[in-house]
Amino acid sequence: MIEVNNLVKEFDGFRALDGTDMHVKKGAIYGLVGPNGAGKSTLIRHLTGIYRQNEGTVKIAGEDVYENPHIKEKFAFIPDDIFYFMQADVMEMKRFYQGMYPKFDDKMFYRLMEYFPTINPKKSIRSLSKGMQKQVAFWLAICTRPEILILDEPVDGLDLVMRRQIWSIVMADVAERDTTVLVSSHNLRELEDVCDHV
């Protein structure tokens, strides 16, 4: 499903990734763990087509990722630094996601609403706490029904109850649809609890 071979990325002469290889099978929950600055986010930005590699290949389902909108429809990405349109509320972002992702599941959106009872869907997302903004990002992403879910520090800043709830939803999606999940974190203990491979 995900194949990275001999990936090299340089920034102004600094080699952030040096011959990185990674192979993730369909339906796996794969964890990337390491301290800040280890290259986890750089690798993820290649997998999502944000960065173009200096050398090597980055493929999803056998296709190059960079500048490939067909492949990008197949995955949802929750970055560590979430961005929302100014003054957009959850319902407006839902409509935006529906326009971007043909498989967006409206019924699932309303079903998952009960898992996020503290979030007012008509309130500006930017006025919510960072933890609530992460919950909104996850809520919207999972409703796109992605084949691949790419998560960068997804539960950082969430309380224990919400962390468990998020992982429960992810596990149910993997079991139901054989979703492939790639998650990066500095928390090895948490990844060991949820991942097939770390």
Q: PLM features: what roles do these ranges have?
A:
Residues V198:
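H-loop (His-switch) and adjacent beta-strand-loop-beta switch element
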Residues I2, K9-C195:
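ABC transporter nucleotide-binding domains
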